Amino acid sequence: MAKQGSKEKKGYPELKEVIKATCKIRVGPGKETLTEGNCLWALKTIDFIFEDLKTEPWTITKMYTVWDRLKGLTPEETSKREFASLQATLACIMCSQMGMKPETVQAAKGIISMKEGLHENKEAKGEKVEQLYPNLEKHREVYPIVNLQAGGRSWKAVESVVFQQLQTVAMQHGLVSEDFERQLAYYATTWTSKDILEVLAMMPGNRAQKELIQGKLNEEAERWVRQNPPGPNVLTVDQIMGVGQTNQQASQANMDQARQICLQWVITALRSVRHMSHRPGNPMLVKQKNTESYEDFIARLLEAIDAEPVTDPIKTYLKVTLSYTNASTDCQKQMDRTLGTRVQQATVEEKMQACRDVGSEGFKMQLLAQALRPQGKAGQKGVNQKCYNCGKPGHLARQCRQGIICHHCGKRGHMQKDCRQKKQQGNNRRGPRVVPSAPPML
């Protein structure tokens, strides 16, 4: 079937690159990827099911139409597995057509379902607004900003599913990765400046990278001030960044240029930090080696940071942060013990003072002693429990010697059976008391 379809339609030449990208998507984590035959099977099957769409080119609009029609079909019991495979393969092709790169088939289905939910919410909202504004179709709708007939706009917060999708991409690929940049550029075109910066601040990522991104944004703002002197029709940095504006004010038409500039600044900052991360000598890649002293590591780190083309406050932040996060495990533990909760804010000099003995013979002996020290419930039981008789820790009440009087000698501190003045009589049931002592010197 695949060979025949390829001959008839020449392998869907308009989808050549899309199919090539789809073949990189895995069926599951650690499993095999989709093949060209899988894609051709799905496309040919769809053409067979929906013959009225067969002659139309495979655009994203046609794919969404097919997707909606497939949802309305109910397969037979014996065909449910093939039908699920058809939907999953189509979801992967749709993601590739939109430029997305999901790692697995399940991720592709999740992306399409998420976008479908956004589309349904948008349509539901449009039906309500259309009752008040019948000519709404003549105006362009910008989600979550909606142009209304009267000239104003309404604002809606970023959908949670979109935020979660961006969080997932940031955790899997990194905050400055191309995948995150592509996703942010796709969704943020209709966000206010406040939305863009707030979402970026709440994304998971390296603290040093976030500080570098903020530094790049400050550089873009300074460049804007130099190149655009204040004037009646000139946007200010505060307007571009959404400072001092409500969400309703930021969503108005006069702020469209400001939103576009803010998004461009963020994209430029992400790309700059990404290029910096892959450049040789990147400070974030300078980490302490197992056999390297902390002083030598700090010397390499400071040299790399000083060579970076960033401002002095960012250099100071990188020195304070990376001197802890990029240190070895032993040095981090030593800094935690010495500096406590202020370890992240401590200066480099304080951290060097705390780690001066790491790697020495005395430090190694200390680690060995800690490793050999008894732990667990058995080792803590005698230390934590207190005697109910005398109130002192280290023994139980039945083991307490305080207040005990020997009935043989009349002295305190031991019982009659343990009395040393008592003569041994015959073979006792318990035998003679054994007193620990060192072996004799031979």
Curated annotation (Swiss-Prot):
Name the InterPro entries on file. Gag_p24_C, Primate_lentivir_Gag_pol-like, Retrov_capsid_C, Retrov_capsid_N, Znf_CCHC, Znf_CCHC_sf
SMART domains cross-referenced by the UniProt entry = ZnF_C2HC
Residues of the region (Disordered) are: 420-442
Q: Per the record, a Pfam family?
A: zf-CCHC
SUPFAM superfamilies documented for this protein: Retrovirus capsid dimerization domain-like, Retrovirus capsid protein, N-terminal core domain, Retrovirus zinc finger-like domains
* Record carries keyword Cytoplasm: no
Annotated Gene Ontology cellular components are: viral capsid
Give start-end ranges for motif PTAP/PSAP motif. 436-439
GO molecular function annotation: nucleic acid binding; zinc ion binding
GO aspect biological process, one term: viral translational frameshifting
Q: Which UniProt keywords apply?
A: Capsid protein, Host-virus interaction, Metal-binding, Repeat, Viral budding, Viral budding via the host ESCRT complexes, Viral release from host cell, Virion, Zinc, Zinc-finger
Answer yes or no on keyword Repeat.
Answer: yes
Note the site residues: Cleavage.
363-364
The family assignment reads: Belongs to the Ovine/caprine lentivirus group gag polyprotein family.
Stored PANTHER family: ENDOGENOUS RETROVIRUS GROUP K MEMBER 24 GAG POLYPROTEIN-RELATED (PTHR40389:SF2)
Q: Any idea what this protein is called?
A: Gag polyprotein
The gene from which this protein is expressed is: gag
